[in-house]
Amino acid sequence: MDDKTKNDQQESNEDKDELELFTRNTSKKRRQRKRSKATHFSNQNKDDTSQQADFDEEIYLINKDFKKEESNDKNNDSASSHANDNNIDDSTDSNIENEDYRYNQEIDDQNESNVISVDNEQPQSAPKEQNSDSIDEETVTKKERKSKVTQLKPLTLEEKRKLRRKRQKRIQYSVITILVLLIAVILIYMFSPLSKIAHVNINGNNHVSTSKINKVLGVKNDSRMYTFSKKNAINDLEENPLIKSVEIHKQLPNTLNVDITENEIIALVKYKGKYLPLLENGKLLKGSNDVKINDAPVMDGFKGTKEDDMIKALSEMTPEVRRYIAEVTYAPSKNKQSRIELFTTDGLQVIGDISTISKKMKYYPQMSQSLSRDSSGKLKTRGYIDLSVGASFIPYRGNTSSQSESDKNVTKSSQEENQAKEELQSVLNKINKQSSKNN
């Protein structure tokens, strides 16, 4: 029995030794790991080191509890070896206490080494701190800027709606104020003397008098700009056959500009024993005593289509050319049904054709200036200009039907007359060439 108990005791001791070795090895490895981690985080603050120590203590307490549980299990298995187990427990307790003592010493040594290392590192890091201060300030400013940016929170839907409403209200208020101001300005203008028509400028009237136009316009002292009807005034003025078109412009604050385009008076036609003005549109002005009639030619002998063609030819001439014409007579021949005779204001007779007379008469001012005249202004060579075919000067010879009463007593021309004839013919030839080139 003693041998068995000894063997059992030895086996139990061996098991205990193995467990102690296992626990020591595992605790050693764990301590090494924790030490390596502690050295890695040695640059951290003291709070980290205290947390590390607390963590190691927790591991140690776990191992201690584990060993106690194993010892309790073994006590339950063998009731006979109760005394031996108590001895073992005492030994294990002593071993655990020894391990606690060793562990506490190791932790104290580690803390001392960390303190020494920190003390040794502080003088080395001192010069770095001076350089790092500026860097820290820059990082702080950057962080502050970022924080300011990040502090801007996104707007919610309600806030966006409020902003939209505010903007809409501002726009509405501005529009309303502008409208109110405009209405106020308009009302002030309407009821002030500025809106009364003070000036009427009439332009383009040659045959119709200004007083007659003002009478038709009906502008009074109390007439206002906004009540004056341009449409009615234009219709009333265009009822006059002399007026071709009218344009009226209102110029603020109180001026009317009236631009008139008239129908030209191209001729005077005999009607019921009187000579009445004939307009370019073919209308006769009846009862026009107040019309200003300038030097208009007298038309005689025209009827039907020939009259219309002659009216068209005269309307195509410029007013300057028409002033040279004193009379136009329809004088057809057997071969030329469109033959006409023109008597000019400077004493010349011109024969031409209705279809071409308007184009050829535009050169008449040059013809008249090239003629040779005496001191009294009369022509040295009496004759007529034929524009029916080309342009030629034909002097009067003897008594012909085409000669006037003053020309019947004309005899042979002198040398001066022949020279004047040659000069006039040369001018007519030049004009004839120019007209052929233009055509």
From Swiss-Prot:
Transmembrane residue ranges: 174-194
InterPro entries recorded: Cell_div_FtsQ/DivIB_C (IPR005548), DivIB (IPR026580), FtsQ_DivIB (IPR050487), POTRA (IPR034746), POTRA_FtsQ_type (IPR013685)
Write out the biased-composition intervals (Polar residues).
119-133, 426-439
Topological domain spans for side Extracellular: 195-439
One of the Pfam families matching this protein, by short name = POTRA_1
The superkingdom of the source organism is: Bacteria
The record's family statement is: Belongs to the FtsQ/DivIB family. DivIB subfamily.
Subcellular localization, as worded in the UniProt entry: Cell membrane
What membrane topology does the UniProt entry give? Single-pass type II membrane protein
Q: Does the keyword Cell membrane apply?
A: yes
Locate the compositionally biased regions of type Basic and acidic residues.
Answer: 64-76, 405-424
Entry's Gene Ontology BP terms: FtsZ-dependent cytokinesis
- A GO CC term attached to the entry: cell division site
Q: Where is the composition biased (Basic residues)?
A: 26-38
Q: What protein name applies here? A: Cell division protein DivIB
Q: Which UniProt keywords apply?
A: Cell cycle, Cell division, Cell membrane, Membrane, Transmembrane, Transmembrane helix
Q: Where is the composition biased (Low complexity)?
A: 77-86
Q: Which PROSITE patterns match?
A: POTRA
Instruction: Give the region (Disordered) as residue ranges.
Output: 1-96, 119-149, 396-439
Q: What is the role of this chain?
A: Cell division protein that may be involved in stabilizing or promoting the assembly of the division complex.
Q: What is its main location?
A: membrane
Q: Per the record, what ranges lie on the membrane's Cytoplasmic side?
A: 1-173
Q: Where is the composition biased (Acidic residues)?
A: 11-20, 87-96
Q: Which residues form a coiled coil?
A: none
Q: Where is the POTRA domain?
A: 195-263
